Amino acid sequence: MAKVQGKNAAEKENDDGLREKMIAVNRVSKVVKGGRTMSFAALTVVGDGDGRIGMGKGKAREVPVSVQKAMEQARRGMFKVALKNGTLYHTVVGKHGASTVLISPAAEGTGVIAGGPMRAIFEVMGVRNVVAKSLGSSNPYNMVRATLNGLRNSLTPSEVAAKRGKSVEEILG
């Protein structure tokens, strides 16, 4: 199983201003009557460095083709996360399958304190200060999905105020 994670993860910036990062490449096999058919499954994340993030997975007989498919899927599925000075507005919990991630905002100068696939997500998204903890399964796919689910559920103070029918000043105290 060839996994690419952490500092070794392939990262590049395109001419369209998007940062791409490959999180994992797995060799998978399909058993057929004539033997095993080998192919590769790639997991990637794409971000613009300003709060937009998307993840994709691609599968093909060759590694470059699977990575390319994953990048295309990630570009199509991008969504916006509200950031405040390079960090989040509040603590969020994300779940997917057996993976649970706890993501907390951090003060300026803290840096990205997160492991594995979560670090790649925050780097391409443009988050500079965050503390994240992975609980449960450390499967890269589940961790990425759990992180994105948590980020999707984050709200700005104005959104919280609108939900509660109060003003932003009342929410912030």
Swiss-Prot record:
Residues 18-81 form the S5 DRBM domain. Pfam families: Ribosomal_S5, Ribosomal_S5_C. The keyword rRNA-binding applies. GO terms for cellular component: small ribosomal subunit. Keywords: Ribonucleoprotein, Ribosomal protein, RNA-binding, rRNA-binding. The keyword Iron-sulfur does not apply. One of its GO terms (molecular function) is structural constituent of ribosome. One of its GO terms (biological process) is translation. InterPro entries: Ribosomal_Su5_D2-typ_SF, Ribosomal_uS5, Ribosomal_uS5_bac-type, Ribosomal_uS5_C, Ribosomal_uS5_N, Ribosomal_uS5_N_CS, Ribsml_uS5_D2-typ_fold_subgr. PANTHER family: MITOCHONDRIAL RIBOSOMAL PROTEIN S5. Belongs to the universal ribosomal protein uS5 family. NCBIfam families: rpsE_bact. With S4 and S12 plays an important role in translational accuracy. Located at the back of the 30S subunit body where it stabilizes the conformation of the head with respect to the body. Part of the 30S ribosomal subunit. Contacts proteins S4 and S8. The N-terminal domain interacts with the head of the 30S subunit; the C-terminal domain interacts with the body and contacts protein S4. The interaction surface between S4 and S5 is involved in control of translational fidelity. This is Small ribosomal subunit protein uS5. It comes from Bordetella avium (strain 197N).
